[in-house]
UniProtKB/Swiss-Prot annotation:
The keyword tRNA processing applies. The lineage of its organism: Bacteria, Pseudomonadati, Pseudomonadota, Gammaproteobacteria, Pseudomonadales. Keywords: Isomerase, tRNA processing. It holds the Pfam family TruB-C_2. This is tRNA pseudouridine synthase B. Responsible for synthesis of pseudouridine from uracil-55 in the psi GC loop of transfer RNAs. One of its GO terms (biological process) is mRNA pseudouridine synthesis. The gene is truB. Disulfide bonds: none annotated. It comes from Pseudomonas fluorescens (strain ATCC BAA-477 / NRRL B-23932 / Pf-5). Belongs to the pseudouridine synthase TruB family. Type 1 subfamily.
């Protein structure tokens, strides 16, 4: 008997998941996609299986704006295990070296300023960055080590929250592309004892915080009671991650031409940058960029939601 193909639903919006421990970001995405029975889905930047916390999941029209969330600043809390280094710079790797921990709170506080502001990081071998089309982590698993260029990242906040014995809990606010594993490893080397990430929790992703998230268990419970459509109540509007952008409202006439790819003028437009756009009914219809001539050029459009 032929298997009936599941017809997926055309749903749009963002679900802020508190990613559970042990899940890859894609596995978490596919699980929530199944609960929604959503046609189109994508996430906004991977969290390691070891990590938990804020993972914005985009569905339908919201996937058009996922890159802007991917580029946003992030916040983390991490538990650094001092005295050991591992192959992966986290608890999943094999121990490479063990050293005595003779540092105290004051020693840690003294080195943290060196890692604030704009710093250079060498990406870890166990990362999704690619070399000749191959992810570095695959090369690392095969025992290969390749040269990686240092990258500039910005650490806006680096604070010692707690110190006990051989562990230090840190709060980090950082730019996109920052590797917390590398940061912790570098701090450990500066202290002379080595360190790796024992725990990692993302507390912020762009404008989104942990307080706004929903757990997988909560989604599953709602789905068990009411099916796919019951999960829709957790969907946030597609432009939720862009609320700090200037908002313009077009007339019916301007919206028509803009949705057909034509740049238009708006009296309240800023002099430059990206903007969110609503039609005359207050419906979000996409994002645009202010051109040199002052017109708003369409960049990503939503025709209906």
């Amino acid at each position: 008997m032929a298997q009936v193909k599941r017809i997926r639903r055309n749903v749009s919006g963002i679900i802020l998941l508190d990613k559970p421990l042990g899940f890859t970001s894609n596995a978490a995405l596919q699980k929530v996609r199944w609960l929604l029975n959503a046609e189109k889905a994508g996430h906004t930047g991977s969290l390691d299986p070891l990590a938990t916390g804020v993972l914005p999941l985009c569905f339908g029209e919201a996937t058009k704006f996922s890159q802007y969330l991917l580029d946003s600043d992030k916040g983390y809390e991490t538990l650094a295990q001092l005295g050991k280094t591992t192959t992966t710079a986290d608890a999943e790797g094999e121990v490479l070296q063990t050293r005595e921990v003779t540092v105290g709170r004051a020693d840690i506080e003294a080195v943290l300023p060196e890692f604030r502001g704009e710093i250079k990081q060498i990406p870890p071998m166990y990362s999704a960055l690619k070399r000749d089309g191959q992810p570095l982590y695959k090369l690392a698993r095969a025992g290969e080590v390749v040269e990686r260029e240092p990258r500039s990242v910005t650490i806006a906040r680096l604070e010692l929250l707690a110190f006990e014995g051989d562990t230090a809990r840190l709060a980090v606010d950082c730019s996109k592309g920052t590797y917390i594993r590398t940061l912790v490893e570098d701090i450990g080397e500066k202290l002379g004892c080595g360190a790796y990430v024992a725990e990692l929790r993302r507390t912020q992703a762009g404008p989104f915080s942990l307080a706004q998230t929903v757990t997988l268990e909560e989604l599953e419970a709602v789905h068990a009671e009411g099916g796919n459509e019951a999960v829709d109540r957790f969907l946030m509007p597609s432009d939720s991650g862009l609320l700090d952008w200037p908002l313009l409202q077009f007339s019916e006439h301007s919206a028509f031409y803009w949705l057909n790819g034509q740049p238009v003028r708006a009296p309240d437009a800023p002099k430059f940058g990206m903007v969110r756009v609503q039609d005359h009914n207050g419906r979000f219809i996409g994002i645009g960029e202010v051109s040199e001539d002052g017109r708003i050029a369409p960049r990503r459009l939503i025709r209906s939601e």
